[in-house]
């Protein structure tokens, strides 16, 4: 008998033991990564390494798991370390309060991991991590853009080469291609186009983090700050955790190979006819 027996009932004894011996790194423990990390430790993953340089800001309160009024100004990885250990004291959790970049990739990836979760929102750091994982043959799953979106039903999981309608994914694809990486990166993304920003609110936006600016990714220095909601980053993080656990267990993951949204009745009929082998009627 143990606190996580409900998970063992679902995945079986062998699956549970596999998860207990798994080593996973989560890079970026903000809105996406905090939920991914907690879901992984609750699922029974025995070792987690958490990497993030940042501290909790007031503007994190709307979407990040560790963010409360009491935790503003505290280290994100420190808070998640404490939270994960309080959930499963037997888990080996390591916190690295550092900014992931190409110069420290070898050091941070050196311990060896069964899976890496990319929940970084800085393009330079994100590309550095994905290239490092690709070059090492390291399994990784990456989150594309959750900001500016509202519809949780449109999150998909595919190879990055199949992403569309996602400005972040487009930039990442181009940067990866410039470094010789065309595909082989699994990612969670949405085909919902980013919603527009309220110009009145945008004009009034200012960084209100009480601990001030940081040297890597300050909101006050961004050209555009996307609007966010509570559920979309969480859904992305939980999706990443689900992909990792299913992959570790050797189980298939439902992806965007499924039939896309059918759209209008005419398009729906055309797609149904195509699947049945019927000739489409003239428009």
Report the location of each language-model feature.
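Adenine nucleotide-associated cytosolic modules
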Residues: 1-283
């Amino acid at each position: 008998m143990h606190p996580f027996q409900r998970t063992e009932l679902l995945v079986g004894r062998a699956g549970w033991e596999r998860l207990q011996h798994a080593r996973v790194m989560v890079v970026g423990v903000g809105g996406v990564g905090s939920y991914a990390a907690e879901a992984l430790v609750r699922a029974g993953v025995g070792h987690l390494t958490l990497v993030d340089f940042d501290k909790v800001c007031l503007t994190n309160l709307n979407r990040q798991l560790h963010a409360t009024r009491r935790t503003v100004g505290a280290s994100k990885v420190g808070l998640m370390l404490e939270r994960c250990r309080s959930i499963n004291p037997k888990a080996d959790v390591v916190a690295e309060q550092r900014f992931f970049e190409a110069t420290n990739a070898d050091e941070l990836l050196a311990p060896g991991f069964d899976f890496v979760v990319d929940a970084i929102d800085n393009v330079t750091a994100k590309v550095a991590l994905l290239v490092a994982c690709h070059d090492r043959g390291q399994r990784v799953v990456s989150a594309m853009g959750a900001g500016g979106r509202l519809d949780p039903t449109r999150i998909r999981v595919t190879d990055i080469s199949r992403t569309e309608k996602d400005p972040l994914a487009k930039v990442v694809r181009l940067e990866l291609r410039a470094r010789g990486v065309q595909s082989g990166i699994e990612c969670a993304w949405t085909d919902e186009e980013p919603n527009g920003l309220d110009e009145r609110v945008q004009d009034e936006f200012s960084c209100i983090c009480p601990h001030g600016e940081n040297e890597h990714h300050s909101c006050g220095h961004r050209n555009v700050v996307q609007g966010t909601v509570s559920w979309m980053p969480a859904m992305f993080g939980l999706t990443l955790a689900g992909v990792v656990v299913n992959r570790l267990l050797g189980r298939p993951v439902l992806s965007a190979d499924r039939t896309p949204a059918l759209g209008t009745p005419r398009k729906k009929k055309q797609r149904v006819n195509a699947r049945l082998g019927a000739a489409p009627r003239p428009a």
